[in-house]
Design a protein with these regions (language model features):
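Conserved catalytic SET/PR domain of SAM-dependent protein methyltransferases, capturing the structural core
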Residues: 1-159
């Protein structure tokens, strides 16, 4: 973790990642690292069709979900671990909790959960991209991971 950009802090719902300084839109906040496994786990991040990143002590595990996030996960087309980056969607001030929308990377969550983000566009129940309707998919399209886009195209749900 680049300590000049992110730090871990205890929040109301447990440990979370916070910015330590202001950053511009599209800044790389973190390069995600870990082991690759074929099946989703409770704290994994899907980086390919049957490829998930896991690490018991990685700082990215403390990124909270939000339906209106301030960051996104950028994956290169090969899902190379060096190509998994967390980028700012908007300019961020120092001390802001960093969030991303889990529905942009996860086809089917190993452990679905009710969302408590409170956003007007809240999905309500976070189960995975496969459960989203056309309107929600259209809104998320710019930040959907390549493997999610490919799966949706194969199902005829994304043009």
């Amino acid at each position: 973790m680049d300590d000049s950009i992110l730090t871990l802090a205890l929040g109301p719902n447990g440990t979370r990642a916070l910015t330590t300084r202001a950053v511009e839109r599209d800044a790389v906040l973190l390069v995600l690292e870990g082991s690759r496994v074929p099946e989703p786990e409770r704290h994994s991040l899907q980086i390919g069709e049957a490829l998930h990143l896991v690490s018991p002590d990685a700082p990215w595990r403390y990124l909270d979900h939000a339906c209106e996030p301030n960051a996104w996960i950028e994956l290169d087309a090969t899902a190379d671990v060096a190509g998994v980056r967390l980028r700012a969607l908007v300019p961020l001030e120092a001390g802001v909790a960093v969030t991303f929308n889990y529905l942009t990377t996860e086809w089917e969550l190993a452990t679905p959960f009710p969302c408590g983000c409170g956003a007007a566009s809240c999905a309500g129940w976070i189960r995975g991209a496969r459960h989203l309707d056309a309107a929600r998919l259209a809104a998320l399209r710019p930040t959907l991971a390549p493997h999610v886009r490919a799966r949706l195209r194969a199902e005829g749900r994304l043009g």
